[in-house]
């Protein structure tokens, strides 16, 4: 099967890297393979190489800088992991799918011709170069719309979900500000939504930030009570990027429609991964990200309902492209890449969903078998590809350092540069200790069963090792109730 070949190619972390001067997408074929694409034939046994000399140099520098410390460790597990991931030049297992996904080689293949022969400006309507690229852009627009059962005319291409979210919140709020100046969102939204909402407060808007329960779900009753006559917009994300909780989008949409309030949802983590029907769910605006669905980075979209029409004030001034909402020349390679990625999400939805759920169940069962581990967020209303677990008595950052052979994100930071506990985990009632001990695992199309088994084994060993260094773990094992201890500060 082609997807099995692609999965082995993209996620085989045991494969050594070869240094090349530039990024290459070369296939070495052996055995049998039958499916052809426009510029490459993918066959059984192909290997995809996507590294550069820069990565090789960075790896060598990391080895020089950290090698002595890592090799000095008496712990064989950590040393073995370090040596495999650095000394022998193998890539870590990638389980950070909520941050980004690998670009599907079939998507890359579709994009290539737009960097060579089909390089026309899609907005040039006086010659064939513009006509042909415009035609391909509109095909991509239809593919993007089909995922959410929308009209292609309702899809506005943007640079990504951050721009889409800002466009939705700021554009709607500013257009209706003379009659309505109230916005509702939740405390667990993505940073770009929270910051956009806060910037609206600086402009004089009133913003309500709704709490969520311990499962990470918003209360429908509290939402309805928060709506006022002057409320213009409600923004609630479909799937949370940290804990994978799926909000009751259909019910929220019904409430908003009943009160004649526009409903926006950040679907960066949901688009193509859970069923979405914008009409059935009464969604008026929906943000889309390409690189979360195995498409290229730097492109996204915003669904904007036409009936009843949603009006927005544009963020950018210019030539009035994209129905006047988003001026600027579209990048055909990226747009077509997003379109093909969306098409694949539809075609392979059943397979991908079953694959992700099976591996997620396997991973979660293995992780929760470790003593004193907790799943963060709802167990029932959750996208399976996002698994967030707290390991008590272990610092999440320390665990990540011990897992150099696995690419993961810590649930203890809302951004990679921050050392503050996750605001999402705080919102669902986790204390600082548990928030700091959380790790997010992302499973996707190219994740393999062997990788999941390796991760379970590695996590189990290294959590045990780090806990042996913790005095609190020793006290817990001795039966001491840590909640009864009065800690003194100095």
UniProtKB/Swiss-Prot annotation:
What does the UniProt entry say about where the protein is found?
A: Mitochondrion
Kindly identify the residues recorded as the active site. 414
Q: Which PROSITE patterns does the UniProt entry name for this protein? A: AA_TRANSFER_CLASS_5
State the reactions this protein catalyses.
(sulfur carrier)-H + L-cysteine = (sulfur carrier)-SH + L-alanine
Q: Per the record's keyword annotation, is NADP included, yes or no?
A: no
Which EC number applies?
2.8.1.7
Which positions bear N6-(pyridoxal phosphate)lysine?
A: 292
Does Iron count among this protein's keywords?
Answer: yes
- For the ligand ([2Fe-2S] cluster), the binding residues are 414
Query: A single GO CC term, please?
Result: mitochondrion
Top-level class of the enzyme under EC nomenclature: transferase
Q: Where does pyridoxal 5'-phosphate bind?
A: 161-162, 241, 269, 289-291, 329
Matching entries from InterPro entries are given as:
Aminotrans_V_dom, Aminotrans_V_PyrdxlP_BS, Cys_deSase_IscS, PyrdxlP-dep_Trfase, PyrdxlP-dep_Trfase_major, PyrdxlP-dep_Trfase_small
Q: Which UniProt keywords apply?
A: Iron, Iron-sulfur, Metal-binding, Mitochondrion, Pyridoxal phosphate, Transferase, Transit peptide
**Any single Pfam family the record assigns to this protein:** Aminotran_5
Gene Ontology MF terms in the entry: cysteine desulfurase activity; iron-sulfur cluster binding; metal ion binding; pyridoxal phosphate binding
Cofactor(s) annotated in UniProt = pyridoxal 5'-phosphate
- What biological-process GO terms show up in the record? [2Fe-2S] cluster assembly; intracellular iron ion homeostasis; iron-sulfur cluster assembly; mitochondrial tRNA thio-modification; tRNA wobble position uridine thiolation
Family per record: Belongs to the class-V pyridoxal-phosphate-dependent aminotransferase family. NifS/IscS subfamily.
What's this protein's function?
A: Catalyzes the removal of elemental sulfur from cysteine to produce alanine. It supplies the inorganic sulfur for iron-sulfur (Fe-S) clusters. Plays a role in both tRNA-processing and mitochondrial metabolism. Involved in the 2-thio-modification of both 5-carboxymethylaminomethyl-2-thiouridine in mitochondrial tRNAs and 5-methoxycarbonylmethyl-2-thiouridine (mcm5s2U) in cytoplasmic tRNAs.
Protein name stated in the entry: Cysteine desulfurase, mitochondrial
Species annotation: Eremothecium gossypii (strain ATCC 10895 / CBS 109.51 / FGSC 9923 / NRRL Y-1056)
| Organism taxonomic ancestry | Eukaryota, Fungi, Dikarya, Ascomycota, Saccharomycotina
């Amino acid at each position: 099967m082609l997807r099995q070949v692609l999965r082995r190619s993209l996620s085989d972390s045991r494969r050594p890297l070869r240094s090349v001067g530039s990024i290459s997408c070369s296939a070495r074929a052996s055995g049998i393979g039958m499916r052809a694409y426009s510029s490459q034939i993918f066959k059984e046994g192909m290997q995809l190489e996507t590294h550069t000399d820069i990565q090789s140099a960075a790896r060598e520098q990391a080895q020089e800088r950290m090698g002595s410390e890592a090799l000095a460790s008496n712990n064989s597990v950590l040393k073995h992991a370090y040596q495999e991931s650095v000394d022998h030049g193998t890539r870590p297992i990638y389980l950070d799918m909520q941050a980004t996904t690998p670009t599907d080689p079939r998507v890359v293949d579709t994009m290539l011709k737009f960097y060579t022969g089909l390089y026309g400006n899609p907005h040039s309507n006086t010659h064939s170069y513009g006509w042909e690229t415009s035609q391909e852009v509109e095909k991509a627009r239809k593919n993007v719309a089909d995922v959410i059962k929308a009209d292609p005319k309702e899809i506005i291409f943007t640079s990504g979900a951050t721009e889409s979210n800002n466009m939705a919140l700021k554009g709607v709020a500013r257009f209706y500000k003379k009659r309505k100046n109230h916005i509702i969102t939740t405390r667990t939204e993505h940073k770009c939504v929270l910051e956009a909402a806060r910037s609206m407060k600086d402009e004089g808007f009133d913003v309500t930030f709704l709490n969520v329960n311990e499962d990470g779900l918003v209360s429908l009753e509290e939402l309805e009570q928060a709506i006022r006559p002057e409320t213009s917009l409600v923004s609630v994300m479909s799937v949370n990027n940290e804990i994978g909780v799926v909000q009751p989008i259909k019910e929220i949409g019904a409430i908003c429609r009943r009160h004649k309030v526009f409903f926006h949802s950040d679907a960066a983590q949901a688009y193509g991964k859970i069923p979405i029907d914008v009409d059935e769910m009464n969604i008026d605006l929906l943000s889309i990200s390409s690189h979360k669905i195995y498409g290229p980075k730097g492109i996204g979209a915003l669904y904007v309902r036409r009936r009843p029409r949603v009006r927005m004030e544009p963020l950018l001034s210019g030539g009035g492209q994209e129905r006047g909402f988003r001026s600027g020349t579209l990048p055909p390679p990226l747009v077509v890449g997003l379109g093909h990625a969306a098409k694949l999400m539809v075609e392979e939805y059943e397979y991908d969903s079953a694959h992700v759920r099976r591996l997620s169940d396997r991973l979660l069962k293995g992780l929760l078998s470790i003593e004193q581990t907790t799943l963060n967020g709802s167990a029932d209303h959750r996208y399976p590809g996002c698994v967030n677990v707290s390991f008590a008595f272990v610092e999440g950052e320390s665990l990540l350092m011990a897992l150099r052979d696995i690419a993961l994100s810590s649930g203890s930071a809302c951004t990679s540069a921050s050392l503050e506990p996750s605001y999402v985990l705080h919102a669902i009632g986790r204390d600082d200790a548990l928030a700091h001990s959380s790790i997010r695992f992302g499973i996707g199309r190219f994740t393999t069963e062997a990788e999941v088994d390796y991760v379970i084994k590695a996590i189990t060993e290294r959590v045990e090792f780090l806990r042996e260094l913790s005095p609190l773990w020793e006290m817990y094992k001795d039966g001491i109730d840590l909640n009864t201890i009065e800690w003194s500060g100095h």
